[in-house]
C-alpha cells in the first residue's frame, strides 16, 4: 500500500490545489474523493493530515510521557537502506541498521529497536529524538 500525505490541513494557503493538480496530472488513476483524501487506485491513496512540528534533535523536549506507533506497527527504510523507527526520521538520526548490509528481521529484533517499542509501550521513549517530536504528542 502507498499513502501520500499532505501534512498541512487547515493552513495550506491554497497550495493544496496546486499540489493536487500536479499529482492528478502525473499519477494515473480514478481519484475518488473520500473523507480522508483520495483513493487514486487500488492500494494507492492521497490523504490530508494536520500540520505538526517535525522531530528535530535541537527542538525542545515535547514531554516526558510520549507514545508513538513507531516500531509498534511500522518502521521506515530510507533510500540508502537505513532503517528508522518511523518515516519522520528522514535524516536517519535513529539508524537501526541497513537493509543492504543485514537482514531486516535482525534489524527489527535488535536491542535498540526493541528498546524503542518497549519504551513507547511504557510511554517513556528511549530515544532523545522521539521526546522532541511534535507529531508524537497527538498520541500522548
Predicted regions and their residues:
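Radical SAM enzyme [4Fe-4S]-AdoMet core and its adjacent flexible, acidic
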Residues: 1-118, 122, 136
